[in-house]
Amino acid sequence: MFTTKKPLLLLFFLGTINLSLCEQERNAEEERRDDDEMDVEVEKRFLPIVAGLAANFLPKIVCKITKKC
């Protein structure tokens, strides 16, 4: 009976270690993905502000350069 328990315990132990390593790798991938998503969110918030400022000041700058206001 003990001879059959020993391999089963070994398989259980190795499986537990394998699952632990997979979980750590998955968590690391999620953290990297979260950083990428935060960068995209910052870009989405930053670009409309820049576009709005450009839309306000570009006609004024063109008007002053060409002096056709």
UniProtKB/Swiss-Prot annotation:
InterPro entries: Antimicrobial_frog_1 (IPR012520), Frog_antimicrobial_propeptide (IPR004275). Keywords: Amphibian defense peptide, Antibiotic, Antimicrobial, Cleavage on pair of basic residues, Cytolysis, Disulfide bond, Fungicide, Hemolysis, Secreted, Signal. Transmembrane segments: none annotated. Residues 23-43 form a propeptide. Residues 1-22 form the signal peptide. It comes from the Eukaryota. GO terms for cellular component: extracellular region. Expressed by the skin glands. GO terms for biological process: defense response to bacterium; defense response to fungus; killing of cells of another organism. Its main location: secreted. Disulfide bonds join 63-69. It is found in: Secreted. Antimicrobial peptide active against a variety of Gram-positive and some Gram-negative bacterial strains. Has antifungal activity against C.albicans ATCC 10231 and a slime mold isolate. Has hemolytic activity against human erythrocytes. Belongs to the frog skin active peptide (FSAP) family. Brevinin subfamily. This is Brevinin-1CG2.
